[in-house]
Amino acid sequence: MPVQGSQRRLLGSLNSTPTATPHLGLAANQTGARCLEVSVPDGLFLSLGLVSLVENVLVVTAIAKNRNLHSPMYCFICCLALSDLLVSGSNMLETAVTLLLEAGALAARAAVVQQLDNVIDVITCSSMLSSLCFLGAIAVDRYISIFYALRYHSIVTLPRARRAVAAIWVASVLFSTLFIAYYDHAAVLLCLVIFFLAMLVLMAVLYVHMLARACQHAQGIARLHKRQRLAHQGFGLKGAATLTILLGIFFLCWGPFFLHLTLIVLCPQHPTCSCIFKNFNLFLALIICNAIIDPLIYAFRSQELRRTLKEVLLCSW
């Protein structure tokens, strides 16, 4: 994705020479000040991408194979897995091509590399946007299933879910193309940051409201069975811990990347901001880590999906 620092890694590798970079060390910024730079080895980056790729391929395969999983909720989960798959795959492709160019194993004209870089940028950006959208869609789906349980199947139908999925994909590709074309405009970067904050607020509000409703329900049961008061307290703590982990992982994995975009707008030349820009590859690695964690949170907790996945793996042998 075209941002400062590592945004033109493919194009820059045509004239670059490999240098030994420490995994964790101090690097000098433009003013000569020392700042902390965390380098992500290419091998680790590719390994994370491969793990994410395998996980999300398994999720998509299991949902496609089992007709019992062809419901709106699993439709959103499948599309989230597909988005995460594209995020990991596009970053792996860029890293692999870069390594081949740097090693001299792949010869290409600058114009060809530029076009390839643009295509990868669009895929990466659109898959990031769609991933955030599907995380929000899953939160909305769960909210409706709790607060409108009796009307859920009339509100969230499969045709509506498919239309929502199509709209998300089309909008993601369209806006990512515009973002890549006009990435050097501050308004474009601010739009991306505002979109991330909107998804964060949406998920936080919905999940907190769902937790409050669940605690109220557990409290009502505890009143009928006074002996279960301690169990109710434990449920509240467990729910709060789950919510903290869910939102915490989302913020920790996505937040640094959008902080990077924010600082490009606010302080592109400031020494402190320049230090943060040096860790762009780390921020991408965190997003890939989120793509690894998403199936664990949203997919593999389903007993039906795990059973189907087991059948798929056994059949493959």
Swiss-Prot record:
Q: Which UniProt keywords apply?
A: Cell membrane, G-protein coupled receptor, Glycoprotein, Lipoprotein, Membrane, Palmitate, Receptor, Transducer, Transmembrane, Transmembrane helix
**Pfam families recorded:** 7tm_1
Q: Where is the signal peptide?
A: none
Q: Which InterPro entries match?
A: GPCR_Rhodpsn, GPCR_Rhodpsn_7TM, Melcrt_ACTH_rcpt, MSH_rcpt
Q: Where in the cell is it found?
A: Cell membrane
Q: Which residues are glycosylated?
A: N29
Return the similarity comment.
Belongs to the G-protein coupled receptor 1 family.
Q: What is this protein called?
A: Melanocyte-stimulating hormone receptor
